[in-house]
Amino acid sequence: MDASLNQWIRSPINDQPLPPRLTREQGQVIQLRQHIRKTLTAVWQKATHLAVREAGRELGFSINFEDVPGLGEVLGTLPPLEANFDHVRDINLNGTGVTDSIDGFLSNFERIRSLQADKNRLTRLPEALGSMRNLAFLVLTEGTVQLTESSIAALKELTLLERLGLSLNPLGLAPDISRMPALEVLELSQCEQRNWPTGLFDQPRPETFSLNLTANELTSIPDVEPGSDQARTLARTRLSRHRVSDAVLEKYNAYKTSVGIDPERINPPSGVQGRRQWTRGPGVKDKAEKQALWDRLEQAHGSEPF
């Protein structure tokens, strides 16, 4: 791997051989290549400062290129890496401007559990995602990604996902989450969605399931039994009231009322998380009573500002 990376650093930029005296732009590219080589070498050698730990136990290693402008485009020119990176758990490419040429880099990390690449220049889902069957956390917000039938099918196979963030992309088509039983957070704000996610109710969704569909002009809402768990999932969904049809808004408010949520409430009740903050601490007494009090307060009409 060292030999190929060293050769890459000295390789042409934009098909132009390196001159004896580099321009400012060429110098910046060389610096980014060197930074990438240093990071990849360290993680390959399992440098301790890159380890991901939980409760004192080493879970894997992390690659963090966050907020390095221009690095995403340079990563797209990286040659194949002749090394094993199965020990890498997390990759953070937020703010690097990754492009559709990132597949070559990502193909080296099939076993990662977390991939973040917001503020990107992607126009499609990376094909390498199809091999990342261990992914639990995927965030690709703020790009120009559009979904296709093939990319939806590939995304559907990421059955271990717990969080999927695709907000601020012109997706057009809705993602299929029918095979994602562990999904807890789905962010689809401002994604040019007309319909709800495919397979929303093909799996039981927990009380804490969070779905963000704000800034989408929804033209329909699923038909479910008022007061049911499915009605609660719909009622807790965040959407923009002024962007949906009157019929959708009327049914949405009815579902909220059926599960005891103030129909004028903008954000869903905090539920378990709010109760946990209210009742935590070594000096807390009458925990059950406090939980019940919190629930009554959240369900009261007009309680959201409080």
Language-model regions, residue ranges each:
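Terminal targeting and flexible regions in eukaryotic proteins, enriched
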Residues: 1-60, 258-306
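LRR N-terminal entry segment and analogous cap-like coil->beta motifs
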Residues: 20-120
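The feature encodes a structural signal of leucine-rich repeats
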Residues: 49, 72-81, 99-106, 125-129, ...
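Conserved hydrophobic beta-strand positions in leucine-rich repeat
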Residues: 61-63, 89-93, 112-117, 135-140, ...
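Conserved "Asn-ladder"/turn position within leucine-rich repeats
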Residues: 66-69, 95-96, 119-120, 143-145, ...
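Tandem repeat protein-protein interaction scaffolds
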Residues: 141-157, 163, 171
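Leucine-rich repeat domain C-terminal region
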Residues: 154, 176-297
